[in-house]
Structure formats: structure tokens, C-alpha cells
Amino acid sequence: MRNNTAFEQFTLNPCEQIPLDDKHNIGFNKNNTPDYSSSASSDQLLKNDINRHEMERRIAFLNRKQALFNAFMHDSSSSLNTMESNIEKVNGLFPNDNSVIALKPNEEKLNSSLSVENNDSTYTDATLIAPKIGLDRPNINAITIDVDGHSLQNEISSSTDKLSPSQSDALFEQKQDSLFWNDNAVIVVSDSESDDNNVRTKSSLNDHDKVNMKEKRNLELAFMNSKRKKLELPSLPVLSTAGPSYTNSLALPPFHHHNNYKMFNTTHTLEDDKFLQGKGTSNNPISLSDEEDNEINFQNKRYGSDSVILPGGLLHDSKLPEPGKHLFHLQWYHDRFHNIEGFNLSDSNNQKVQDDQQQQLEELFKDLDEQLVNDPTIREGTPAGLIPTLMEHQKEGLMWLKRLEESSKKGGILADDMGLGKTVQALALLVTRPPESKSVKTTLIITPVSLLQQWHNEILTKIAPSHRPTVYIHHGSSKKHKIAEQLMSYDIVLTTYNVIAYEFKNKMAYDKSIEDNAPIKKFEHLPFFEAEWYRVILDEAQTIKNRNTLAARGCCLLESTYRWCLSGTPMQNGVEEFYSLIKFLRIKPYSDWSSFSKDFTIPLSSNINTSAPMKRFRGLLKAVLLRRTKNTKIDGKPILTLPPKTAVKSETDLSSSEMEFYNTLQSGAQIQMRKYLQEGTITTHYGSLLVLLLRLRQACCHPWLIVAREAAVDDNDSFQAKNRAIYNQIYPEAVNRLKLIETLQCSLCMDVVAELLIIVPCGHFLCRECLTHVITSSEDMAKQTSNENISPKCSVCEEYIDTERLLSYALFRRYSGMAPIVDADNKLRTENISELLPKQYSNILENRQMGMKIFTDPKHWTTSTKIEKALNAVKEIIKKQPTDKILIFSQFVSFLELFTVPFRQEGIKYLMYTGGLSTAERNQALINFEVDPNVRVLLISLKAGNVGLNLTCANHVIILDPFWNPYIEEQAVDRAHRIGQDKPVNILRIVTNNTIEERVLALQDRKRELIDSALGEKGLREISRLNTKELSFLFGMSSR
């Protein structure tokens, strides 16, 4: 436990130290009741009461902020890195508050110069720096401290040369005091020349305790220098005494009621402590305050100087940004300061900017209650031209779609649960609202490549011939049109996210050539960005969840009248991913990242007092998103009435040898995790940590999974020579790019994975399953068109893929001289793990010449605890329900392959469905599974089977290993539990005790509870990228 004594002695308690109104001599009696004995006017007394109320709230807030920091430090080490990390964390929670936690220097180690070193001997603790409370403060210009050796006093003196001696002394006093707001010492101008280095304390107006001014200045300079080091500034703009200064006028804020939203017309300032709770407009900061309502707003506030830093969190990027570029918590401009939303505090234009945002918010929340029509008597029927009859919830959805297109939003997000007919509702909209102009008539539909043909079939089968649009598919070898006019001659154009990403990349290259006045090597038309679309529809819109990808940036750049997102899971990896959809839809003001992150991303990621920002977020969702689940009721009845679904968790213990192997792996992983924690390098080693977690999860299934591919490798000289030759063919710029990647994210499915394959020579990478899918899809196309020249292409740059020139990321690290995926001194390197294998599993090493074939060879095959558990469950189902079919899901294809041996031995007929099969093979497997009564089991990989399949012929689901995101599992289960299912569905989750799997399930439960309770019925499917606490929990290093 950390000793916080040094920190606690800096506790701010200005109630006892600051008179409330120095001008009017109004203060408090000893029992803290107002003293009305003075001759102050009633207005002044009213102001005194209000100031006292606000001061008490402010003090309570600061105490909570300090207590929060103590709580962060409670279970932490006392190292400088840990302290800095916790300081950044706490400061980041309150970006609009002008108090700040800062490092407190050890005065014995300080010298009077500005060159304070950032090391443990200099900084020993932390301190809370806060402005004076309850006093009107003058608007004093900030001081710039030059680090070339000029002293603070010389700097101040140089700015007061033109003033009289008394004016200069007074200004020196004010400026010096303004620099360090939290201490009890105030610098005053001494009456005697020999006493000018003394100060008096303000614990009492009559006390004159002497404190050495030099020590105080050293402390101030140490704090400022630490900020300068964080910013890498040659000089530091000092914190000024800026903040709201209230006049005698007092008024309640005007506000408008829009349902339960209060839109306060207020000006956000550096310190707006009238809105600590954070309700009302997006301007309001979050707080730990217990206050529920904010009734009072002061007008006519005064602002500080241009050169100020809002101390609302340390910068994540230590480099100075370019002018006008936004940062995470803080925005820095060369000539002036802007607040977190980008409003210029010292510009006369400020009010206009806020008025514009107020109008944008009013437009966003306009007519919320009228958007959904629940009255069946006024609900429109199936539109002419649509073949299927719409279900009632689809009719309701169509009216919502039409209403949003007719509003200022001109689009939104249809987020109905899987199987509720998002596609048919979108087609109904196309039929109902055709374009009025022939020049702008084309609807662009962007979809994953696997759904292209499905969309085409839906259009042909769902829209009547009398209304049927002309359709063009722009993908692969079928891309016959190169200019915008050709595309715009069709009613509907179907394409993929990869095509948009590729064209956006070309656009960036073209724009750069124009900017640099460089010769253009090859002119290419950019038809998607040159066209003016009537409507753009993103199917599986979560594909653009990462706002920085080429696909996301390209989609946002498309020009269209109407814009729609279709997605059953609009968020999967954090609130910030929802921003990408909002940006595409151009929903103001939140299409601006600074506004979105300030109002939602930062406060919702803090997990502290998220009630107010969550309410605002739900308001945003209600304004632009429609979501119904299978259990949603319409006209008093559920949308769908399905057979019951029963989920059972089957817990099992690993065998003693399996558990010994697992514990050894976990111990090594914990050592590595602690090392990254101590170094503060969790983010940069995120990929390595995923590998460690992957190995723990694999060990719960079967020890072979960990060393399977390594054991299958012929690690002789010829193998090394061949792969090094492949490595040498990677473009040099690609090698440099690969060395800098921090997160192993597949460029096609966007999942963060532990195993990537690098395409040579372009250096782009895919996960093994996606790469296999790209190759097999190309082979399918070649067969369908009888064109043997069709070859697979990279999904990023569309360079041809040579299947003989693929390199694993692990080998790339070896050949490029990078460190192994874990450190060389760690026991978790592959060769060491192989030595740790229990004896009964070591035959995979002894028979490495068999490669992956050993997984399906009965002579060498070895079972595991989890295989036996699943096998017994399958046999029990077959015995009791001889006609039922079973789906078995796993994230690991090689684990599914291990089941083929016992199934053959037991005479259980099965089929496989993985990304490694061609499209034709997968389709045939589904047909055979449905029509052949003898086929009882379908072994299916989680990635291949969680979208786009109808498997209602099965009513038993076995999940072999839990996934981080519970909603991915639920999507897989819904392959069986959907329209067409006529039997009860039984789900069996096999979990090993005392392993990472228990912690994954606990993490799932916490996430599900948080999301479903916060975002309503079933909620949106948001699972955060694993943070440090979650990683520690998964490695078994913390209890929660």
C-alpha cells in the first residue's frame, strides 16, 4: 500500500483560508454560517450566498478529485512512471477543469535554475494545483519563461518597465501568486527593502509567517518545467489567473425543453464551475459532484489571455502539432488557446460558433418523438414494386427511413438485430423514394465482398420487374467502367470496401502530386469520388469502425444526397468506433472528432460518473439510430416468436499434466506483463500480449495448438534460405512500415489477431483465414468465368498475390532483426514452449515431418480434456435425439480438425465449414448438412460462421472456447436460432476451471451488463479494446 502522507498535507481547504468577499468584508462565523453584520447590500449578500454554495461544491469536487488520485495510487507502485501514468489518467477525466494533478518536486534536490531533471530524485510525490476560489480575479497576462537562464523575476520585471514602482510591485505580486495556486503562501510587496524575499501566509489575514521566496519559486519553476518537457517546448506559456470573473448581474439561463434535454445557452470558459455535473449542452464538463441539477448560470464572464494552457490532462503525443491540428485532451495553436471543443475563448467570433452548435443540436434532436410511428392504423403498407409483403416492424422501419431522409439529417443508422430484414427495408426505401433527377439518380451500395452476390440476388428477387433497377457490380475482373459518368448511368452500383479503399489511396497520391507540383506518373480516373451519388448505403457498416483506415476515410469522402448505415453491431471495439459512422453520415456537431471525443469518448471511457455523458450518448442514438431485437414488441407482440433458447455452461478441470503446462505458460506470461507494466510499454507491446493470451487460450483446448505450425515447419537450412529469399523481396519502404506497426490488425476483417501472413512484395498483411478466403474466391471466379488468368489480389493495393511468396510475421521479425514476439530471456519463446509440452503430447515434435497432417492421423492423434467433454456431449445428443443436428464452433480451425479423428472412430458423420474452403465447397457443405439426415455435426470456425448463414436445420450449438466479444458468439448462435427454426435451441459452452477462460467469461458478463443497462434493450454491441486493467485481469494478476 502506498503512503500518501506527503500528498495529503497539500489538501486544499480554502473554506478556512480565503475570505469570501474581500471587497465587502463579508465572511463566515466560526460555525460556518454567513455573517450579515456588514453594511453590504442585499445584492451583495445574495452573491455571497451563491458564491458560498458554489465554493462548497468546488471544494467537494477538488477533494473527490484528489481522493480519486489516491485511489489510483493505492495498489500501484510508487515509481515515477506509475505516478505519471496515474496523473495523466486523473487529469484526463476532467478536461475542462482548470485544476491539475502535477508532480511535486523534492525541494532539497532543486536548484534555482530552470533545468530541472525528470527523474525519481527530483520528483517524489504529487500535488493538486487549483485556482483561488470565491474571489474576483483580475485578467492578468501570461508570462513566458525563457529556459536560457533568465530568472522569473527578471522576466516579470522586463514586462513592467513602463509602470510606476508601485504599479510594478503590485503586478509582480499578482503575477507571482498566479503561478502556483494551491499553496497557502501569497507573495506580497514588502515595506522594507531588506524584507523583499519574504511572504505571508493566508491562513489568516493577520498572520505574517515568513517563508523563503526562493524555495517557493523553485517549486513553481519545477512544475512549469515538467509541463514544458511534456510539450517539448523551448519555453513554457505559464498558467495565467484566467477564469470566469463574474459581474454583479445574475440571471437564470434560458433553456428549451426537447423531451428531457436541457439546452443551456451558456458560454463555456476555462473554469465554468457552475456546470460541474455535466448536464445540459455538450459544453458541460463531467464531475464527481453529488449535485443533480444545475440551476445557476452567470453571464458576462471575463476570459484570460491568449497564451494559456488548459491543464486538463498531459498530452499523449509529445510532439508539437501543426497549427490547427486537434489533440486528445488539449488543443494547441501558435497564437491563441482554444478550448476542448475548438471554441476560441478570446475571439469575438466565439458566440457565433456556439450559436451554430446550438442550432446543430436543436436540428439533431428535432422531432425525436415523431420519428417512430407505433400506431398501426396510420402505418403505411408494402410499397408497390416490392414483391414480399413487409412485416409490421419493417413497415414501421420504412416510415422511419423515409422520415429521416425528409429531415435535415438525410440519413441514419438502421441497426436492427440480425434476421429482421435490414436489406428488404433498404430496398423498400429505394422503391418508395426514387430519384427525381435523371442526372443524380444512382444509389451506391458498399458491402463486404462476401455479400456482393447476395445483394444482387436480393435486388433481382425482391423488386418487381416493373420497378426493377439497372444494376452494375464493380469488383475484381468485372470492373469494366472507369469513369463516373458510366457508373451514374445505372440505378444501383454494387461495390466493396476494398475498392473504395484502393481508389481513396489513388486519390491521395494524385492530390499529393498536385500539391507538390510533381509530375503524375499515371493518370487514373477516380469514378467514385468524381460521381455525385443520390444515395450511399454502407452494409455491415461496422467495417469502417476504425476511422483511420483507407476504407473509412474513403467512404466519408463520397458525395451523396442521402447516406445510410446498415449494421446489427454498429460498435464492437469502443465508443470511438461509432464516431466513424457519425462522420460518414455528416451528423453535426458530432461529425467533428473534437466534439465527439470530448462529449463521449473521453468521459465514457473513464468508467467514473458516466451517467450524464451516457444520457447524452443515448440521445444521439435516439436521434439517428433505429434498433429492434427479436424480443422487441410491436402491437403488443414480439416481432418474432421463436422456440426457446437454453444456454448451459459446462465447467471442467484440466488434467494434471495439462494444468501443469498451463500454469507454466501463465507464470511466464505474467512475468512479461509485469515487465511491460513497469516499463509503461503496454500499448507498444499490445500485439505481443495478444500472442501470450492466445497461447493461454489454446492451452485450454489442446497443447498441440501452441506449437502446431512451428512443429510443422522444416527448420533446416533450405527452409531458412527459401524464406529469407522471400523476405528480401519485400519492398524496402514496406519493411520500414512493418517495423513500425504496433497492433496486428488484419487489413480485411479489421480484427486484431496474433498470427498474420505478409504478402510479398507489397508488405500488406492478412490473417490466415482472410488470406485463404481471398485466394479461394479468386479460384472460384476463375472457374466461373473459365478465365485461368484471374489471380488473387491484395485487398489494400490490389497487387497480385503469389501464394508461393507469403511470409509469417514471426519470421519477418526474425529476418528484419527485430526482437522476438516475446523477449529472448523469456521462457515463452517457441522452442522453450516445445520443451514444456507434457509427455503424452510430445509426439507432435517427434513426428514433425508429418506437418499438420498429424492432427488428423489416428496413429499419432492425442485427445484432450475439452475434446472428451465435447465428444461425450455429442454422443449424448445423438443417443437421445437421433434426428437433431449439432453445430460446433471454435476460433481455432486446427482444434476443429482434431475432432475429425474421434468422429470417424465413433462413426459420427460430420462436415467442416471454414475459411479455407472455396465458396463452392462451403455452399456444398451447407447443402449436404441440411439435406443429408446422416450428417449430424458441422464443425465451423467462429469467423467463417458468425455472419450470413442460415443453419436452422441444427438446434444444438457447442461453443468450445469463449471469445472476448460475447456478441460475436451470439451472432454465431443466431445462425440456428432465427426465422425457420421450429425446435428448442440448446447451447453448451465448455469452460475450463481456474484458467483464462473463466476470466474471459467474467469480462463478457461485465461488458454485457454495462452496455445493456446503459444503452437500453440489448444495447449496442460495444466491447472495448482490452485496456491495461483488463489485460492484468486476463493474465490472472488482479481480481477485477
Swiss-Prot record:
The enzyme's E.C. designation: 3.6.4.-
Domain Helicase ATP-binding: 403-588
Keyword rRNA-binding set for record: no
Helicase C-terminal domain: residues covered: 866-1032
Keywords from the UniProt entry: ATP-binding, Helicase, Hydrolase, Metal-binding, Nucleotide-binding, Nucleus, Zinc, Zinc-finger
First and last residues of each zinc finger (RING-type): 746-798
Protein name: Uncharacterized ATP-dependent helicase C23E6.02
Chief place of localization: nucleus
Annotated GO biological process: DNA repair; double-strand break repair via homologous recombination; negative regulation of proteasomal ubiquitin-dependent protein catabolic process
Source organism of the structure: Schizosaccharomyces pombe (strain 972 / ATCC 24843) (Fission yeast)
